[in-house]
Swiss-Prot record:
Location of this chain's protein in the cell: Cytoplasm
Protein name in UniProt: Dephospho-CoA kinase
Record-listed ATP binding positions: A13, S14, G15, K16, S17, T18
Organism taxonomic ancestry: Bacteria, Fusobacteriati, Fusobacteriota, Fusobacteriia, Fusobacteriales
Organism of derivation: Fusobacterium nucleatum subsp. nucleatum (strain ATCC 25586 / DSM 15643 / BCRC 10681 / CIP 101130 / JCM 8532 / KCTC 2640 / LMG 13131 / VPI 4355)
Enzyme Commission designation: 2.7.1.24
Molecular function (Gene Ontology), one example: ATP binding
Function noted in UniProt: Catalyzes the phosphorylation of the 3'-hydroxyl group of dephosphocoenzyme A to form coenzyme A.
PANTHER family per the UniProt record, alphabetical: BIFUNCTIONAL COENZYME A SYNTHASE-RELATED, DEPHOSPHO-COA KINASE-RELATED
Length: 193
């Protein structure tokens, strides 16, 4: 069976997850890298590796990893972010590699925020990028994640720029308007699959 793998990516708060959910509702098989990474990071062996790398300062009072503390640490320091990604990314990449080899569905969507940075784009036949203007993105993050502007800016700056993503994309969907407009654009994309 011939299989098409679509890599779906976009910066934080660009609307990528909304597009991902919409595609899943349309019946496409979607594999969300954030969920896969979260599941991987909850394995005891991986948690031990994260704690030994970042120390007890990332733990809450119950001895569990405090994701908010960890996020603040890794987005303050690029080397620390790379260390965390070095623990998680190889395991996520392996998951996608195994999935591609299984050839289970006709069309599979890899929903990966760091598609290019992780190298997962190499497994994809087509790349769909969702972008939003910087200020739109910033306001969405602040509202959604209840974080301050400074941390939101650091998170955006830690990722590839829209310009860099666009260069590597087969299809670009701009999401600066409302959901109805976004879904119309996704429908047009679906007609090309």
């Amino acid at each position: 069976m011939s299989i098409m793998i679509i890599g779906l990516t976009g910066g934080i708060a660009s609307g990528k997850s909304t597009v991902s959910k919409y595609l899943a509702e349309k019946g496409f098989k979607v594999y969300d890298a954030d969920k896969i990474a979260k599941d991987i990071s909850e394995k005891k062996s991986v948690q031990e590796e994260i704690i030994s790398t970042f120390g007890n300062k990332i733990l809450d009072k119950n001895g569990n990893i405090d994701r908010k503390k960890l996020k603040e640490i890794v987005f303050e320091n690029k080397e620390k972010l790379e260390k965390l990604n070095g623990i998680i990314h190889p395991k996520v990449i392996n998951f996608y590699k195994e999935l591609k080899e299984k050839k289970t569905d006709k069309v599979i969507i890899f929903d990966v925020p760091l598609l290019f940075e992780s190298g997962i784009d190499k497994f994809c036949d087509k790349i769909l990028v969702v972008i939003s203007d910087y200020e739109v993105q910033l306001n969405r993050i602040i509202e959604r994640d209840k974080i301050n502007r400074e941390l939101a800016e650091k998170i955006i700056k830690s990722q590839l720029s829209n310009e860099e993503r666009i260069k590597k994309a087969d299809v670009v969907i701009e999401n600066n308007s409302n959901l109805e407009d976004l879904f119309k654009k996704v429908e047009r994309f679906c007609e090309t699959i």
